[in-house]
């Protein structure tokens, strides 16, 4: 059983502020603190760490659209970041992931492939592949104004299968999850299938694979469901079952789901949702899983009501190892007020807030977005 170290470095981006935060979480003291505020090229709403752990990739919310790679500098008391390269993007990206050949970007109207060098740095060149996700008259709207609106109504995420041979792209606007085959020698993609969501109003936002490679969890932004799909023939996804993040009595139209992630042992799946307006708290929900990745029950094992709506965030990122008492640690970011929490979860006791840090100041409203654990 994997056991957490005594402390972790965590990197955190924001939606609008040019800062990258280095945080440390002391597992035994159960304490989270800011160690460094690194200079950033803009607001980084999504972060990804290269497979070797030496490069940070980031989306940039700003004009002109671009993507960024940073060197992760280690050797001191805590990790810091150093800019390695900016590259232009046709549209503002919402999500990136990487292997040792390429970085993949979901940016609303399309999915892009950017190549990286042997050190993981983005090459100083445009995307080598772009897959248009728009259909019919939608293509006429695909111009420079499709920034945040494009992300809200288009391709929103990109994640690789555990063996690195497939890329899953959740597309809110097309109500589907696209599958691409990955050439591991070159990093290039080939479109494989378009997998329509179960409900006409689902709006897939993120698609996260189980370590066994056969199950993919699709987070539905509009309906607040976490759905399990099975990879059927290496080309298509088949719906199995789903659980709702919010309680039955809540109005789905007042929420927009944000994130889906697994516990370190892949025996629990977590989903989070935000309130559409201030005064509507969001939820983080957990379901126990069978060893094959299917739901033990689609009824929630535990729910946690968040302190605020979460703003644009209420994003969870799970610690890669269990805590000393078998607990699952995760970060929860809030952009409404501007704080980050560490949550601990066990299937027996549910969720608890371990620590909280206010990031916003009286002089500046800072909007925490997402984190990565190092």
Swiss-Prot record:
GO function terms (MF aspect): 6-phosphogluconolactonase activity; muconate cycloisomerase activity
SUPFAM superfamilies in alphabetical order: 3-carboxy-cis,cis-mucoante lactonizing enzyme
Family per similarity comment: Belongs to the cycloisomerase 2 family.
Alphabetically ordered keywords of this record: Isomerase
Oligomer and partners: Homotetramer.
GO biological process, one term: beta-ketoadipate pathway
InterPro entries: Cycloisomerase_2, Lactonase_7-beta_prop, WD40/YVTN_repeat-like_dom_sf
EC number: 5.5.1.1
Keyword Isomerase: yes
Function: Catalyzes a syn cycloisomerization.
Catalytic activity entry: (S)-muconolactone = cis,cis-muconate + H(+)
Top-level taxon of origin: Eukaryota
Name the record gives this protein: Muconate cycloisomerase 1
Pfam families: Lactonase
The species this protein was found in: Cutaneotrichosporon cutaneum (Yeast)
Record-linked Gene3D superfamilies: YVTN repeat-like/Quinoprotein amine dehydrogenase
Pathway: Aromatic compound metabolism; beta-ketoadipate pathway; 5-oxo-4,5-dihydro-2-furylacetate from catechol: step 2/3
């Amino acid at each position: 059983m994997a056991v957490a170290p005594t402390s972790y470095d965590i990197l955190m981006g924001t939606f609008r502020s040019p800062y990258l935060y280095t945080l440390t979480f002391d597992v035994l003291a159960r304490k989270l603190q800011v160690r460094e505020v690194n200079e950033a090229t803009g607001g980084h709403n999504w972060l990804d760490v290269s497979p070797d752990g030496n490069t940070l990739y980031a989306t940039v919310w700003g004009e002109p659209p671009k993507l960024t790679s940073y060197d992760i500098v280690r050797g001191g008391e805590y990790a810091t970041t150093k800019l390695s390269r900016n590259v232009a993007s046709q549209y503002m990206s919402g999500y990136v992931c990487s292997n040792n050949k390429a970085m993949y970007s979901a940016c609303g109207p399309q999915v892009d492939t950017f190549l990286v060098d042997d050190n993981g740095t983005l090459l100083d060149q445009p995307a080598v592949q772009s897959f248009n996700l728009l259909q019919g008259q939608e293509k006429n709207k695909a111009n420079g104004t499709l920034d945040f609106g494009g992300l809200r109504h288009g391709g929103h995420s990109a994640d690789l299968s555990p063996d690195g041979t497939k890329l899953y792209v959740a597309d809110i606007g097309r109500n589907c999850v696209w599958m691409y085959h990955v050439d591991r020698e070159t990093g290039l993609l080939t479109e494989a299938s378009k997998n329509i969501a179960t409900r006409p109003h689902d709006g897939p936002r993120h698609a996260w694979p189980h370590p066994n490679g056969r199950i993919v969890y699709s987070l539905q932004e509009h309906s607040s469901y976490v759905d399990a799909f099975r990879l059927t023939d290496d080309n298509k996804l088949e719906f199995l079952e789903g659980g709702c993040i919010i309680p039955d009595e809540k109005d789905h139209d007042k929420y927009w789901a944000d994130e889906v992630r697994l516990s370190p042992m892949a025996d629990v799946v977590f989903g989070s949702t935000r309130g559409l307006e201030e005064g509507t708290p969001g939820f983080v929900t957990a379901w126990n899983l069978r060893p094959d990745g299917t739901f033990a029950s689609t009824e929630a094992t535990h729910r946690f009501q968040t302190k605020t709506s979460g703003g644009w965030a209420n994003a969870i990122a799970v610690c890669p190892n269990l805590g000393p008492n078998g607990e699952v640690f995760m970060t929860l970011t809030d952009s409404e007020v501007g704080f980050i929490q560490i949550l601990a979860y066990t299937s027996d006791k549910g969720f608890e807030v371990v620590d909280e840090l206010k990031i916003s100041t009286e002089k500046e409203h800072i909007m925490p977005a997402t984190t990565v654990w190092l």
